[in-house]
């Protein structure tokens, strides 16, 4: 495209359009310092200049997630085979229960890998945001499978408590449960991730909102919840195996441990389920506060008011902002637009920011769409 790039600021009233020419010496939309003329005078300002960094971060996140899931799947398959054989020989419901949950874990790993593949596909005219939410839907499916399998196993545990006509080989159960515990510890270490609220671009530290911490990839987080549930199960099975090994008459410990484990599993899914539903409901992401973002916008010289401020996320870490701002100095709309974008991008981890500048005299206090949202 020849000539300077244009950015258009549209006013709702009379659809008046302001055309602003942006030169190469200006800052880009995510707060990076302006290029000096002697550095690269041919690069024009563009609204997506910093999207390359966001895209690269997303690619690294997905590559890491796929690698972790593939390794976890291989380890999971090996221990599933061992537990099914060991549980069958020992006659232990708890061991077979653990194998069943590992099988569900393996299925969830495959679902997560599929959702990661889908989320990397390009956007279309129908799916303008792309397939990012496939990652969230895949994680939600994993949580639902945990609940379904847990419900079945609770039923079987109750059956064993009511009808205790079964035998358990304590030795085989003890060996198998110890191996299962080791497998789940390894899986938990592989899938565990930690984040911190810094950006290291360009060798500099950019401190984001103090309460915001980058969240784990949804697919990895759901898989980790699966493994933590199995870890609880393995611990409970090992305890029941020790009891049965030394006191065979206390075989009721086997279904009791299965029942106790189920409660722990449901507890471990609550937090991740809440975050997934918040994303699907277009809620404000955890760690980002509406009032803080609004104050960050109002702090820019020339901004008189903010309305239609919306904060939501496509995935755990892809947060989006859109807002309308009013000013009484339209001659500086270009500067105000860039300052607002820079301010929010340097203070919060926004993946995309859309700002509409409007004349302050066109604001309508009676407009139902401009009201401040309730608490």
From Swiss-Prot:
Task: State where Zn(2+) 1 binds.
Answer: 101, 105, 226, 230
Q: Which domain of life is it from?
A: Eukaryota
**Catalytic activity of the protein:** Zn(2+)(in) + 2 H(+)(out) = Zn(2+)(out) + 2 H(+)(in)
Side of membrane Cytoplasmic, spans: 1-68, 120-135, 192-223, 273-375
What main location does UniProt list?
A: membrane
List all topological domains (Lumenal, vesicle).
90-98, 157-170, 245-251
**Positions of Zn(2+) 2 binding:** 47, 307, 324, 358
Gene Ontology cellular-component terms for this entry are:
plasma membrane; secretory granule membrane; transport vesicle membrane
- Motif HCH Motif is found at 46-48
Q: Has the keyword Hydrolase been applied to this entry?
A: no
Record GO terms (molecular function):
metal ion binding; zinc ion transmembrane transporter activity; zinc:proton antiporter activity
| Pfam families, alphabetized | Cation_efflux
Positions binding Zn(2+) 3 in this chain are: 46, 48, 367, 370
As a miscellaneous remark, the entry gives:
Each subunit of the homodimer independently transports zinc ions in a pH-dependent manner. The cytosolic pH promotes binding of zinc ions to the transporter binding site. Upon change into the organelle-facing conformation, the two histidines of the zinc-binding site get protonated at lumenal lower pH, triggering zinc release into the organelle. The transporter then moves back to the cytosolic-facing conformation where the two histidines get deprotonated at higher pH, resulting in a net antiport of 2 protons.
**Family in the record:** Belongs to the cation diffusion facilitator (CDF) transporter (TC 2.A.4) family. SLC30A subfamily.
Report the protein name in the record. Proton-coupled zinc antiporter SLC30A8
């Amino acid at each position: 495209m020849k000539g300077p790039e244009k950015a258009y600021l549209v006013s709702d009233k009379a659809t008046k359009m302001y055309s602003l020419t942006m030169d190469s010496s200006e800052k880009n939309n995510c707060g990076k310092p302006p290029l000096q003329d002697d550095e690269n005078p041919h690069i024009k300002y563009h609204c997506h200049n910093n999207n390359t960094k966001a895209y690269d971060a997303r690619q690294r996140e997905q590559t890491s997630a796929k690698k972790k899931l593939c390794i976890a799947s291989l380890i999971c398959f090996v221990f599933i085979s061992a537990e099914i054989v060991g549980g069958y020989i020992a006659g232990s419901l708890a061991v077979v229960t653990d194998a069943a949950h590992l099988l569900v874990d393996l299925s969830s790993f495959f679902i997560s890998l599929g959702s990661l593949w889908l989320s990397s596909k390009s956007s279309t005219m129908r799916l303008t945001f792309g397939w990012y939410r496939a990652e969230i839907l895949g994680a939600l499916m994993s949580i639902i499978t945990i609940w379904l399998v847990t419900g079945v196993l609770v039923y079987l545990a109750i059956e064993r408590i009511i009808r205790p006509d079964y035998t358990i080989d304590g030795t085989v159960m003890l060996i198998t449960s110890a191996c299962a515990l080791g497998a789940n510890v390894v899986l938990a270490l592989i899938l565990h991730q930690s984040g911190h609220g810094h950006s290291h671009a360009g060798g500099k530290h950019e401190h984001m909102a103090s309460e915001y911490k980058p969240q784990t990839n949804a697919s990895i987080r759901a898989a980790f919840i699966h493994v933590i549930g199995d870890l609880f199960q393995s611990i409970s099975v090992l305890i029941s195996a020790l009891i049965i090994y030394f006191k065979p008459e206390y075989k009721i410990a086997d279904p009791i441990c299965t029942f106790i484990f189920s409660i722990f599993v449901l507890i471990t899914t609550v937090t991740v389920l809440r975050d997934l539903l918040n994303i699907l409901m277009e809620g404000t992401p955890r760690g980002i506060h509406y009032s803080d973002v609004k104050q960050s916008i109002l702090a820019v010289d020339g901004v008189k008011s903010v309305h239609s401020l919306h904060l939501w996320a496509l995935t755990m870490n892809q947060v989006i902002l859109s807002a309308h701002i009013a000013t009484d100095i339209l001659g500086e709309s270009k500067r105000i637009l860039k300052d607002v974008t820079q301010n929010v991008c340097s203070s919060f981890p926004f993946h995309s920011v859309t700002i509409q500048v409007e004349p302050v005299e066109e604001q309508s206090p009676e407009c139902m769409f401009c009201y401040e949202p309730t608490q």
